[in-house]
Amino acid sequence: MKLTNSISPTNLDGEINKNSQPSNDNQQQQQPKINKIINKFSESINSVSKTIGKGIGDLTSSNALDEHIKNHNSNFIDPFYNEEAVVVVDDENIRSLIGDNCSSIGNIGVNGIEAFYGEHNNKKSELIKQFLKINSTNNKSNQTIVVDHMDYSVMERQSSSSSSSSSRSTGVSKLIPFLKRKEKIEILKDLSFYLKPGMMVLLLSEAGSGVSTLFKCLTNRIPKRGSINGDILFDNEPIDGESHHSQYLFVQQSDHHISTLTVKETLEFSIECQSNLSREAKKQLSSNILSILGISHVADTYIGNQSIRGISGGQKKRMTVAVELVKGAKAIMIDQATNGLDSTSAFELLNSIQMISKVSNVPALVSLLQPSPEIFSLFSHILMMKDGEITFFGEKHQIFDHFSDYGLECKDKQNPAEFLSSIYHQAQLDPDCQLKSSSDFIVAYKQSQYYKDCLIKISQERLSNHKFSGDKSIKIIENEKEQQQQEIYQLSLIKQIQLNLKRAFLTTIRDRASILSRVIKSSLLGLLIGTLFFQLDSSQKSANLLPSLSFFLLTFVVFGSLAGVGQVFSERPVFYDQKIGKYYKSIAYFFAGLVSDLIWNFIDVIIFCSISYWLIGLNHSADRFFFFLLAIYLLDCLVNRVSKMVSIYSPNAAIASTIAPLYFSLFLLMAGYLIHRNSIPIYWRWMHYISPFKWVFEAILSNQLHGQTFTCKSDELLPPIGYPLLNVSFPDGYSGSQVCPIIDGIEILKSKDINSDYSYKYYSVWIILSMYLLFSILSIIGLSNITFDNIISNKEKNNGNGNNNYNGKESINEESIKLSIKQHQQKQFESNEKCYLTFKNLTYKVLIKKKNHQKVSRTLLHDINGYVKPGSMVALIGSSGAGKSTLLDILANRKDQGIISGEILLNGKARDKCFNRYVAYVEQEDTLPDFQTVREAITFSALLRLPNDTMTHQDKLDTVDYILDVLELNSIANTLIGKVDHGITQEQRKRVNIAIEMASLPDILFLDEPTTGLTSVAAELIMQLIKRVALDGRSVICTIHQPSETIFKKFDSILLLTQGGFVAYFGELGPNCRTVLNYCSDLGFNCPQGKNPADFLLDFSASFNSASRLASNDKMIPSIRSRIKNVGNYCFDGSSNLNNKNEIKQQQTTTQNVNLGNEDKQQQQQEEANDDNNIQEATSSNSNNNNNNDIIDNYQFSNLNRDTIEIIDSGLPIGFISKTFKEKNATSFLFQFFMLLFRFFVCAIRRRNLIMTRIIRSILLSVVTGTLYLQLKNDQDGVMDRISFIFFTSTFASISCLSNIPTVFEDRFLFYHELNSNTYRHLSYILAMILADLPFTIMYSLLFSAPIYWIVGLQNDVDKFLFFIFVYYLYLQVLVSFSQLLGMVSPTLATANEITGISFSVFSLFAGFIIKKDDIPSYYKWLNYVSITRYLVEPLTVNEMTGSVSFHCEPHQLIPVPIHYTPTNATASEPTKLVFKSFCPITQGNQVLYQFDINDTDKFEDTFVLIGLFIGFLLLILIFSKILKFKK
């Protein structure tokens, strides 16, 4: 039976469906030339697509799919055609969809590709069948999507570079972004197209054309600042904001996954959240999807990130597809899902999508950058866009007719996909073409009959159903329950919370560094406080220490709970995606995180309190202990919740780390310890009552002091011994009488203005709980309503800052490149001194820990031999996970983990310290400076990496201009690079990355997938440039995915790797790839005519028994216990033979050779060989292969491999003089330092939001604190208020420096990359980083210290004022350096925050204020010298307490001393009389210094110590940042 529906005029093989009717009479006769082109390409890829379809045809032979097929049988009127189109889906139809003529691939033998693909596709057909059956309840067949005259625009703050900037844009508005005027920026304009059931639509465009924005509009992911005009209809209904997620599958460009979850765990979480299947069905679906996408072998591998080794980039992309396939078969939307995949994997992925689309009758819209002919054949329609508008939409065969009318014709042997991808570029080069500008293409399409037919069909579709009113504004239906026919969420709220809670626990447990730091922090601080305040008694000393102890507990909680900031930002992208996908409600995610935090916080607190409480010797009553535990726990939870709430509302971690300390600083100040309640001005007293620290401080004190009595030792009585008037007779003196100041706890409470009612402490519990509830509600509101989007319009549109212009001078072709070189940069680009790189017997092993905790030595690369000669290009190709990037890392000297054996020689010599000067490495992950412009980043690289002795400054700048020109970066040259989701596009980032490395004019250029993420035109241009580089005498080694035939033929040699890191071929490519194809042909593998040789070689590399090979990669490492047992058996068992002994010895040697420090980071692709039996079986299998060699053995024993080894061993050509460098770096230290200093300073200025936040924080705290201590009096309260004020300035500085850690942490990955490239010296970077921060630190310190000095009313002395602000700046600078040290040496941001909490707590505790130096136990005296805070408190105290300052007592501050004396008129009945004489404790500043054990000389000594600490931290940063590098 034939397929009667003519929705798609082409079949899977790209052939024109003769039954399809053109949309107008003028085009009923297809041009013979166009038909010839299409048919020629159809023939060229026929064998491949049909062979792949061979196995799929078996879908119809099984009864398992019968029920699914019946569900899709339907008759319907298709408004897109004038006649009735009857779709009858039966066995024959399915065969026609997937190809029923299964011809063999060439003339190949039993072991060839036909047998391989036959078995592979039979399995895949079964998997597709199972997938559709399992997900039958979630599938949505017969969907139709209509986009009718849709526009999309956003309101953006006026760009400083915008030509529309007026006089209103003042200097202030440039500094403060939110003061700029908003302007409307159009991103998408007048889009009209449709997606019908079963249609496969290929979306082709240039970078910056708004494709990703279009997908966001279709999936209802647009930001609130944007607006849509026009209609988007799904099944003739407008988008329903509540249920729209169930209408589509969307695979976006970015891969957002939690790095510490495995592939299987990530997929299972998605299945649980998005399906309502049975438990068994969910397991089958998980296994099914992993198998369809070819990632079953990495199911138990972590996803990974920049610091954690995990799956490869291509596997991450397939993981992104996997979590969407969970939804079932429905409208499919894919935004560049093949980036990072090899061509075979890309075809397999899209072929699976096409099967699902056709069999389930759902539409698919897929954007691709470099589609191969095989991939191109999968699509029925083409949608082309440029500058946010459509330049064509229609059937695949129609597009060639359309463009041929304007002089753009596809040549006979040209790939149609490449022709269409480069059509705008070709139009510029063709003088006969009538289309030049973007508007020409747009107008041409809108004047065509194809556009008119599209509008007619859209109108017919809309008229067929009158449910929609036709309003021109998009209608998002919110909360209309009567229109919801299904549940928005698949799971109940309880189940959602359970799943999120399980995931939260997994991610926390696997962050071992963070857990370890938390446990150590709680234990150490518990021991520290417990032993510092060890066994407090009833003395006056203990009475004075209790308030200090209570306050320190508050600071401990604050410093220890700020680590929650980093967690929010690491999980935010994943949460945003899953929130939009309706995985769970925001409240479920929140509650899961809340419960997780409550549990982990309790563990922290119980460790801390259990240790410290009993060591301190607080009240032994059980109820008092549990209340103490409760109070600390509630405060810890509240502080953690506030930190996370601030993070939810903050755009980045640096802002959150600035705002959160502001909150804590203010409310710590208002707690009632540093300044008593009655001393707080009435206008700030409200802050005292809403401060959570006030309630906990008072509760802890009240809990301990009620019922407590105190006594005095002789040296604690007042007036003290040695007081001049103590023994003077009354009334001039005290007649030797003394008094005990504090006799019970109630007196302490009253002195602190605390309610003495015992039940008062319970109020704090309810108030803290209320505050926790408030901040929880705010968190839920933020999670539900705030999304920091990444649509950046002004980089894509008006200013030309984001699209590839092919107009005028910016149109570059190969001839112009050659001309540009000859005229301008030939001298710079030609390499007079050549470099040879050889590698022999290169093997790479790592140690991993498997699921059963068995340690395994895994070989990732096996005996790799090869070389690269000057002027040649070597391609490293292989499937995903074959080890291409690993090999490139090793050759480029970027691997510092694992065990590398073999020989790598540069010009016949081992690599030395100058090796990286010869090479440049374009890494797969684009590590770029966020706050530099494109030109600045490239110029920075050129100026530092090009030698000054052979090139002038102008030569370097000319090189930069040339690279900008060739890579077509001029249009964005002055645009900030930004982050991945908030800057230039991914395609542009790739070109910038290549440009930065090219700027060094390397002798050997390593490139890891340089064309991934690029359009065909951009890829072609880049490879032209790279070829030109090679022709100028440089060596190029490049891994590449999905190369077009044109690009592939530019290489001179290839190194073909198989799964497991084996070599299948190394040698010349030959003219038209004949050399390598002849080699394959000799082995019985013939490349079909017209097939891309690169794709054929990838198929060839997979034609071996991978299971046995991969199993043999692993060698078990026996445990120490088993080794001892084996040795014992050998010693005592006479039957032990020499082989057993050798086996033990070999295992021991293997253990010694593996880096044991990277067990968790070295998880790789395969998880076979779970026990010794597997290895024995693999060994046996390999031994059997000797009689029937596979492609690996064939190459290993081939003449080609022997010839390669002979060439390597023969050494350098006779007379060759190797190029040598004497210095590791190309430029001097001073030049590097000033370049880095300038970059740091400029980038810091461009962080405007962060600068303004810190400025506001400094000014706000200065004003609030100053007015709180407004014009301090010289009474007794004024004495302690001065000391507490000085101490608070240190607390503010300590908390403020936390915001520096995220910035340093983010920048260090760029530092690692540039340091590996020998861009600069390690010392120059560290010095520049620290010194560049000096001006900003000075500014922040002055904004705080200068106003507050006079507001508080310290001594009216200019010298003392200048000393105050100078010492405060020094202290702040030291803390900044300390935070920079932690940012450089901590493995994670959470760990850095935990270490900061411990450090700042210790600094505050031992500064001499909370506990005086005399009261510090002898075994902790050294911590007083370690405390950085001491060196601020002491000099500022001396500065204030010396000079003309004096103090007095107000009447209520005098201490009455009882005196018994004999009056002159005494009688026998009353010989003595009791009187009271008032005592004023402090009248001079030196008394304060004496009490705190501070000397006048400390003022300057401590100042020099601060300077020394600054230098010391600088040295520590230099040392530890060189030793510790946290990379994969």
Swiss-Prot record:
It comes from the Eukaryota. This is ABC transporter G family member 16. Pfam families: ABC2_membrane (PF01061), ABC_tran (PF00005). ATP 1 binds at residues 205-212. Residues 509-738, 1249-1479 form the ABC transmembrane type-2 domain. The chain crosses the membrane at residues 514-534, 545-565, 598-618, 625-645, 655-675, 763-783, 1225-1245, 1255-1272, 1285-1305, 1334-1354, 1361-1381, 1391-1411, 1504-1524. Residues 17-32, 1163-1189 have a biased composition (Low complexity). Residues 1-11 have a biased composition (Polar residues). It is a multi-pass membrane protein. Residues 1-32, 1159-1189 are annotated as: Disordered. One of its GO terms (cellular component) is membrane. The keyword Transport applies. ATP 2 binds at residues 878-885. Gene3D superfamilies: P-loop containing nucleotide triphosphate hydrolases (3.40.50.300). The gene is abcG16. One of its GO terms (biological process) is culmination involved in sorocarp development. It is found in: Membrane. One of its GO terms (molecular function) is ABC-type transporter activity. Residues 167-412, 837-1085 form the ABC transporter domain. Belongs to the ABC transporter superfamily. ABCG family. PDR (TC 3.A.1.205) subfamily. InterPro entries: AAA+_ATPase, ABC2_TM, ABC_transporter-like_ATP-bd, ABC_transporter-like_CS, ABCG_PDR_1, ABCG_PDR_2, P-loop_NTPase. Keywords: ATP-binding, Membrane, Nucleotide-binding, Repeat, Transmembrane, Transmembrane helix, Transport. Signal peptide: none annotated.
